[in-house]
Design a protein with these regions (language model features):
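Conserved N-terminal phosphate-binding loop of PLP-dependent enzymes in the Aspartate aminotransferase
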Residues: 1-280
């Protein structure tokens, strides 16, 4: 357990590198990441970001990352070399505009990584814990990655807590003294995270997210042609592209705020909607 999502990502990277060196004998491990990714704003994480807002002015950057297009399994397989330690991806890219990959893509990634002995790391910090309609978004493709990165909703909106979840044969490369965090796993955070997990174990909120998500997306799709050019997403999570003739996504977000609707703009033209799972 850690505190923030970015810490979970950093932990996942450390595990992947340590596993590659200790188990596979790779002395210069590389991690394949996706174009359009967002995994946080720490120095290492922005080293493989392609967002100039997050990246510009913060170099020199950490090496060891290779970027491929999101949703392109063939490009991913072509990028794998004997030095490839892991593939890190978001099952649904949130900051990019709630971008959903083609059906079967995640299953293909799992097939490719398994065939090459490469770890698959699913960053479910935004997409996980019922947000997309299942406990994790990789479930849409029936995938079980080597590592799950969890955060945000894990703290119930109350406390910062994140986690890296996987089997002992992978996580076991971290031995006492190799990794830690002062407040990681503190009693309050652990209690809240445990309560969240128990609530999700009922399946009620996953079902609620799917059912209300259908209503959300159906309603948003009716706006197509009236200032909306595209609607994407899963469960209670949607990305809506705004026609530039209407204004910027930030302009629209501020107008919605005046009407009591909270939305977050991203990349000038997209609004993201992520209503609470308890919404009526």
């Amino acid at each position: 357990p850690m505190n923030t999502g970015a810490e979970a990502v950093e932990t996942g990277i450390k595990v992947a590198r340590k596993y590659a060196q200790d188990v596979r004998g790779i002395t210069a491990p590389e991690i394949i990441v996706m174009a359009g990714n967002f995994h946080g704003r720490t120095t290492t994480v922005i080293s493989f970001s392609d967002d100039p807002v997050a990246r510009d002015g913060f170099g020199p950057f950490t090496p060891g990352f290779v970027t491929v297009p999101f949703g392109d399994a063939a490009a991913l397989e072509s990028a794998i070399t004997p030095n490839t330690a892991a593939v890190l991806l978001e099952p649904v890219q949130g900051e990019a505009g709630v971008v959903v990959p083609p059906t079967g893509y995640l299953a293909k990634v799992r097939e490719i990584t398994a065939a090459h002995g490469v770890l698959m790391i699913a960053d479910e910090i935004q997409s996980g814990l019922a947000r997309t309609g299942y406990t994790t978004a990789v479930e849409y493709d029936g995938v079980v990655p080597d590592l799950y990165l969890l955060g945000k909703a894990l703290g119930g909106g109350v406390v910062p807590v994140s986690a890296v979840v996987g089997n002992a044969d992978v996580l076991g490369v971290l031995t006492p003294g190799t990794h830690g965090s002062t407040f990681g796993g503190n009693p309050l955070a652990a209690a809240v995270a445990t309560a969240v997990i128990r609530i999700l174990a009922t399946g009620e909120f996953q079902l609620r997210s799917r059912e209300l998500g259908e209503r959300l997306h159906a309603g948003l799709r009716t706006l197509a042609g009236g200032g909306v050019t595209a609607v994407r997403g899963r469960g209670l999570w949607a990305g809506v592209d705004i026609d530039p003739a209407l204004g910027s996504a930030r302009d629209v977000a501020l107008l919605l705020q005046k009407r009591g609707i909270l939305a977050k703009d991203t990349h000038e033209r997209t609004l993201r909607f992520a209503p609470p799972l308890v919404i009526e």
